[in-house]
């Protein structure tokens, strides 16, 4: 009985390690924060981490602790709890250009042809690398605060639509939608 319980615990931890190993995490920002107490200042650290599986799932988290490794661990756990799925075109770029905002920060994301790479600054680059996007052009305007930039990027990604979802919303075929996108003047077969 005890051996079964022990083995079960080991198997659960092994499953958890396998699940966690599929994720890539990037530390975006670490900040030293201070709490003023009666005896002076008590210092701690706040960490912002982005986690993704490089296949279309990504999340970000924030963690605070007295030590840096503990803050990073808390932020990573928070990010894994807040994963969102993003539809990618050909598994490498966005389906369409989009803008997102949070606070005074705005970001503009543009789909890019193959071979372009990730042209984005700081916090946005971490989001795209963990998401699995290989080709994108991004510009941030306004606030350069890492928290605002990450949240604005997630706001933009949240409003991203795949052709399948657009076609379902409009009650048309995906092929009709794709023909309009590629050709512009291409003949569209009436349904």
Curated annotation (Swiss-Prot):
Q: Enumerate the UniProt keywords alphabetically.
A: Ribonucleoprotein, Ribosomal protein, RNA-binding, rRNA-binding
One Pfam match, by short name?
Answer: Ribosomal_S5_C
Segments for region (Disordered): 1-21
GO terms (BP aspect): translation
Intrachain disulfide bonds: none
Listed under GO cellular component are: small ribosomal subunit
PROSITE patterns the UniProt entry points to: RIBOSOMAL_S5, S5_DSRBD
Any one GO MF annotation of this record: structural constituent of ribosome
Q: Which SUPFAM superfamilies match?
A: dsRNA-binding domain-like, Ribosomal protein S5 domain 2-like
**What does this protein's UniProt record list under function?**
With S4 and S12 plays an important role in translational accuracy.
**Can you state the subunit structure given in the record?**
Part of the 30S ribosomal subunit. Contacts proteins S4 and S8.
Q: Which family does it belong to?
A: Belongs to the universal ribosomal protein uS5 family.
UniProt protein name: Small ribosomal subunit protein uS5
What is the originating organism of this protein? Rhodopseudomonas palustris (strain ATCC BAA-98 / CGA009)
Q: What is the lineage of its organism?
A: Bacteria, Pseudomonadati, Pseudomonadota, Alphaproteobacteria, Hyphomicrobiales
């Amino acid at each position: 009985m005890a051996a079964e319980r022990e083995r079960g615990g080991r198997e659960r931890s092994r499953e958890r390690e396998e699940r966690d190993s599929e994720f890539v995490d990037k530390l975006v920002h670490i900040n030293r924060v201070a709490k003023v107490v009666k005896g002076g200042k008590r210092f701690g650290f706040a960490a912002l981490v982005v986690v993704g599986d490089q296949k279309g799932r990504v999340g970000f988290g924030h963690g605070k602790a007295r030590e840096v490794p503990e803050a990073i661990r808390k932020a990573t756990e928070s990010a894994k709890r807040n994963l969102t799925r993003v539809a990618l075109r050909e598994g490498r770029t966005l389906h369409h250009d989009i803008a997102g905002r949070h606070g005074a920060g705005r970001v503009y994301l543009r789909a890019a042809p193959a071979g372009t790479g990730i042209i984005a600054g700081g916090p946005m680059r971490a989001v795209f690398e963990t998401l699995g996007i290989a080709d994108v052009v991004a510009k941030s305007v306004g606030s350069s605060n890492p928290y605002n930039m990450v949240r604005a990027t997630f706001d933009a990604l949240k409003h991203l639509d795949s052709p399948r979802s657009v076609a379902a919303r409009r009650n048309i075929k995906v092929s009709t939608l794709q023909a309009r996108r590629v050709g512009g003047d291409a003949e569209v077969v009436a349904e």
